[in-house]
Amino acid sequence: CLVFYPGTMFCPVQYRTFLHCLWKNGLAVAALHLTGHGSNPHRRLFSFDDLLQDGLDAERWLHGHGMGPLLLAGHSQGGILAMAHASRSQRMRACFAFSGIFPQSRRAIELTRFAPWAAQRDRLLAGLKILSTCLPRLPLPVFSYLSVKKILAGCLRLPLDRRQARTSYPLAYLYSLFSTSVASTVHCPFYLFNALDDALFTRPLIEETFAAVTAPEKHCIWLPRGGHLAILSPVVAARTAAHVAALASGHGLPLSLHL
């Protein structure tokens, strides 16, 4: 079974095509409706650690109900969560991050609209901490801190269903994300996927992340096109899911093909 963390403000609904392709290739999938996301109440305050705990709880539940062995996967922010999970858990067979970065990296700010002030990163975080204490629920839409143009650059046909997706994040959550530190040692084979034309998670950022990871084995796999949202495209989703299933089989996961 594969535990899947959705990306920024998304839930499993937006990844239905990719998750269905994984299922068709024989993988059972446990896709997470994280705290404050998807079918859960959106008004609740939450932190990065709360979202990570959702995945750790899912792992424990799945093992308790005989659903092992398990894999980890996540896209974008979900890729960061998958990396954090793989650094905490000793029982995962492999981790597949579809874009990811260490938030504590000095270059992580390059993902955001605050890149011109990279030299002031510590002061920005200190200011953000004060603001998040005073206004923890202040809603910030994605375009307030990320470039939507970069997110959408290079995307192919995208049948995106916005149901149950968030429209903003509370300021307190964003501070918890930007200030968290994710351990670079993961306890299972690690696969980092990224599109060559991703304008958000650029090649230099991905290469730096990959170099920093310590794992029993690690592989960086470049998707030829599709931009940051590549795995939401039906064509890329089908090919990537088949690749993931083949790798999963090599790590001892039984596949149940649905023809």
Regions picked out by a protein language model, each given a short descriptive name:
Residues 9-17, 29:
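Serine-hydrolase catalytic-loop signature spanning alpha/beta hydrolases and amidase-signature enzymes
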Residues 3-7, 194-195:
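The conserved beta1-alpha1 loop
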Residues 19-41:
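Conserved alpha/beta-hydrolase
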Residues 226-236:
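Catalytic histidine-centered segment of alpha/beta-hydrolase-like enzymes
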Residues 186, 192-194, 198:
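Short beta-strand/loop motif that positions the catalytic acidic residue
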Residues 9-11, 38-66:
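Catalytic nucleophile-loop/oxyanion-hole region of alpha/beta-hydrolase
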Residues 199-205:
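Conserved alpha/beta-hydrolase "acid-adjacent" motif
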Residues 77-169:
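Alpha/beta-hydrolase-fold enzymes
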